[in-house]
Regions:
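Positively charged n-region of N-terminal signal peptides that target proteins for export
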Residues: 1-5
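Short acidic-glycine-tyrosine-enriched beta hairpin
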Residues: 28-31, 71-89, 173-187
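Boundary at the C-terminal end of the N-terminal hydrophobic targeting segment
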Residues: 18-22
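Ligand-binding loop in jelly-roll beta-barrel domains
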Residues: 62, 89-111, 162-163, 184-206
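Glycine- and acidic-residue-biased ligand/ion/polar-headgroup-sensing regions
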Residues: 52-70, 159-174
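Surface-exposed beta-loop interaction hotspot
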Residues: 96-141
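Bacterial N-terminal signal peptides
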Residues: 6-17
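N-terminal targeting signals for Sec/Tat export/insertion, comprising classic cleavable signal peptides
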Residues: 27-57, 66
């Protein structure tokens, strides 16, 4: 597995050093902006104004990062490919990574506030198909699901009631590793027709 140590900024913001990264925009909807930030190594970045919205980060590469925000002591964070983290809105910060390769992060920038209490489906995938769908974490804005199908495995009939961002972590039937899609509500049964396990992450937007 490729390990990199990087510093970078994760969004196009006023008051932020921008040459440390490139942005590959994927989607921009009323609910969210989705993009991949590719961070250059050995380039400390200062965000003077911070970030006004909450975000979900999915790390496409493994690495170690140093973060200094506010008056707190700098802390070191390690992450792995496919790890998902919540990044709350924040004030000014400085991030630093050290390594010899760029690092990529899929970022989901949440534009609105939570919609309030949501209906509960009797066919929720984490209930009727818990073998394949696990809750990574949940809060009032998102629910993050980790999806795993073994080769030739077939799931149960289930329902998705929310829009979701899906990241494919490996090559699988109908998708390549690192493909990103927005998928709407659906009731269906899924099957991995391939000869290898299928891994993906689904971020449901409330």
């Amino acid at each position: 597995m490729r390990i990199v140590k990087c510093t970078g900024i994760f969004a196009l913001l006023a008051g932020v050093t921008l040459w440390a990264q490139s942005i590959d925009n994927k989607f921009d909807t009323p609910q969210m902006r989705v993009y991949v930030a590719t961070l250059l190594p050995n380039t400390p970045v200062t965000s003077r104004t911070g970030h006004a919205t909450n975000r979900v980060f999915i790390y496409l590469d493994s690495g170690v990062m140093k973060l200094q925000d506010g008056t707190e002591k700098a802390r070191t964070m390690e992450f792995r490919r496919g790890e998902v983290r919540w990044r709350a809105a924040s004030g000014a910060y400085v991030e630093e990574c050290i390594g010899d390769r760029p690092m990529r992060i899929l970022e989901i920038e949440l534009k609105g506030k939570p919609a309030g209490p949501l209906p509960v489906s009797k066919l929720d995938p984490t209930v009727v198909d818990a073998k394949h769908y696990k809750v990574e974490f949940e809060n009032d804005q998102v629910r993050v699901l980790r999806v795993h199908y073994e080769a030739h495995d077939k799931g149960e009939l289930h329902e998705h009631i929310l829009n979701r961002v899906v990241l494919y972590l490996n090559d699988q039937p109908g998708a390549k590793a690192d493909d990103v899609r927005i998928i709407g509500a659906a009731t269906h049964t899924e099957q991995n027709t391939g000869d290898q396990p299928a891994e993906r992450i689904a971020v449901e937007i409330k």
